[in-house]
């Protein structure tokens, strides 16, 4: 969900 997208943003 949103958390998954947030993690992707943090990695990038």
Swiss-Prot record:
Annotated membrane-spanning segments are: none
Please give the coiled-coil regions recorded for this protein.
none
Which GO terms fall under molecular function for this chain's record? nutrient reservoir activity
| Alphabetical UniProt keywords | Disulfide bond, Seed storage protein, Storage protein
Q: What does this protein do?
A: Seed storage protein.
* Assembly with partners or alone: Hexamer; each subunit is composed of an acidic and a basic chain derived from a single precursor and linked by a disulfide bond.
Protein family membership: Belongs to the 11S seed storage protein (globulins) family.
What is this protein's name? Globulin 1
Q: Which organism is it from?
A: Elaeis guineensis var. tenera (Oil palm)
């Amino acid at each position: 969900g949103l958390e998954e997208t947030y993690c992707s943003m943090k990695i990038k």
